[in-house]
């Protein structure tokens, strides 16, 4: 049994030889959540957007290798993003975002989860190391309240120039944004939930009252406050303490 640390006052994990895992919370904290912050790539959607962009130049394998190392915490996120974005230089950006909106696949259970959270008057946001056009698209599609992500630089011929513009949304920035949103809405961070799959999501998981690693990379699962390895992100509602009947009422 791994007992709670100071950063994990209400949750911990139990792993047994038969590979069963429990998520344990204090009863008083389960249904009091007021803020949800999600990662985008491999969390709200199945894909990694930067790899979809890389496919336009047939370099997705090269980009995917760097992405995997970054998500495992083997590379500094800012450095890995710069390396990957540089590889995208020259790709025509005139129609890429409209095309990608048709290609992205929303993760199973996400629409239902967001609908339920909206009924519960919970503030929702996406804080992504990906890119703002698709984060904004998902914000509108899912009824989120906030969207933060990176911006790709574009040259005079409307092609990607291999750079990003503005502050990088890395692990530190995600945690900062969560705290900023909580402060704006007068929400105690202990009433916030952070959901992601990569190493750059860990910091926001730890500043939130409850952090969930969703089908995360193995190294991330070892460090995360709690892990959820199921086929539907809406299973978070069970962790929050809702039963089948209550969930049906929230989703219908």
Where are these regions (language model features)?
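Alpha-helical substrate-recognition element adjacent to the catalytic core
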Residues: 1-8, 13-152, 231
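C-terminal cap/substrate-recognition subdomain and adjoining C-terminal extension
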Residues: 12, 98-252
